[in-house]
């Protein structure tokens, strides 16, 4: 069986085809970074319009890359939420239209379930159950995963997501958009220990997180110490250390509370090398395992949507004729399959 996956929840247009025997047959991705750079962030209306321009050509390119036609596709999966409603509607409408025109099942996929399952595309894939740390520009959450669709939310950010905090702090430091990866590169030049940032919400029980205060702390530190190149690098180092330490502390707690020893880390921030190194040390100390998607599947992409769609199609889960777009959609409301 083969599923075409469509991802348009924010500022990447991602298209992929997944074969349940051969894996990913094609993977097309277009990023809108240049489009939004002048504005310092994603402009929803511009994002939607660009998805309108790019989605169908990328679907055609994915079919050509795989050497397939419409008759070779068994289902069409699309991101139905959460995300920017206009952007979601573009992919959802195109996906549903193709499904009706080609007489194929349409599968609405939860964007964060796509991220959560992305490590399943790797040769070394995790087995259920496990704890998942989902960290991106829009979400930071810890989830107990007992199976596909069987999710228990353990904790989440009560304000900014980790990726959002990276981008906002980078903007404060005068870095270009998107600033998160640039801040991490700058942090590599920094001196550990010159500045010490708080580890928010680690001094109390629970698995919820908070990152907005780190942005304010960074602004105050810059104001008090100047912004020469080395100072900026040292502040970036302190900021990244605080975020990574906080995530690692929360992961340790989640694993202890659940009694599990497998950790999945996914979402855009999961590509952060410092985070990967620290979580690898954590899991080694716990005699457990940690799993990530490859870097190209950390950010938004169609491959994760095609894979998640395939699992639901195999379970007989597909959509009625109405187009489904859900801007706010808690992950733990999905039904197990």
Curated annotation (Swiss-Prot):
GO terms for cellular component: cytoplasm. It is found in: Cytoplasm. One of its GO terms (biological process) is tRNA threonylcarbamoyladenosine modification. InterPro entries: ATPase_NBD (IPR043129), Gcp-like_dom (IPR000905), KAE1/TsaD (IPR017861), Peptidase_M22_CS (IPR017860), TsaD (IPR022450). Its EC number is 2.3.1.234. Binds 1 Fe(2+) ion per subunit. This is tRNA N6-adenosine threonylcarbamoyltransferase. It comes from Aeromonas hydrophila subsp. hydrophila (strain ATCC 7966 / DSM 30187 / BCRC 13018 / CCUG 14551 / JCM 1027 / KCTC 2358 / NCIMB 9240 / NCTC 8049). The gene is tsaD.
